Structures are given as structure tokens and as C-alpha cells.
Amino acid sequence: MIMKSTLTFILGFFLVQFSFAADDETCAIMIGDEIDPEEFSEVAGKKVYFCCGSCVKAFDANTAYYIKALPSLAKKFSDAEKKKLGVDKVKLMEQRYCPIYPERVVNPNSKFEVYKGKKVYFWSSSAIRRWKRDPDKYHAEAVKRGHLKG
């Protein structure tokens, strides 16, 4: 009987721990990438985990923007915390994703190129180099995915 109760307690403990970790299993900025427990930022006393240092750096430089743009991050903070961080003052861009790396979320400080009179934001310099090889092709692909307007 004691053994059964102990096993039930241990199983319950791990299920609770797993349910808390479930939200942080994938990166919010590089959508779908597994988080690295050593790559995190602490905001309002909460640890926000990412897959790599590049995401930590992007988040730290644009914290309020990413919290407003990404529901997975917004739900981690109360309305009062978001207000204190300035999330309510953030104006979201039309574009959310890099046209070359569509699983990566861009921000107003991301590198950009002007394409047919409009700014197109990119995750990295390597994304811009690929874009420049055939901007019409990559633009069409991003429009088809709904990541850029036509």
C-alpha cells in the first residue's frame, strides 16, 4: 500500500512538472525549434526559454514587441506586467515572419531590404543574401504562405 501511494505521488509530481514545462518546449521566436534550458531571458521575475543565443539577443532587444506579437509569450505575463513593460504602447508590424526562414519571427529592428517600395524584414544577413539572388521568387513564396502582402 505504501509502495503504491509513493509511486502515485512520484508519477503525479512528474506529470505536474511536465505540464509546467510543456509551454516552454519549443522556442517562441524560431517557431518549432526545441528550447535549450541554458538559453533564457528573465523578465518580470519569469524565465523565458529560447533555442539559442540569437533568440535571447533578439528578445532582450525587443521584449515588449515580442510579447505583444506572440501569444505564447503574452500569456506568460499579467496585464499589469505587460503594461509595466510597455507592451500596450507597441505598434505591431504587418510582417511577422522572415520570408527566407518562415519559422523565424522578425521585429522592427530586424535587418530589412526595400522591395517595390516596401520594407521587407529578415532574420539575418544570410537571409538577405539569399533574398537578393531572386527577390521575386522569394516574395511570391512568402505571399503564398501569407507572410507578406502581394
Show which residues each predicted segment covers.
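Bacterial N-terminal signal peptides
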Residues: S5-Q17
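Intrinsically disordered, low-complexity terminal tails/loops enriched in metal-binding residues
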Residues: S19-G150
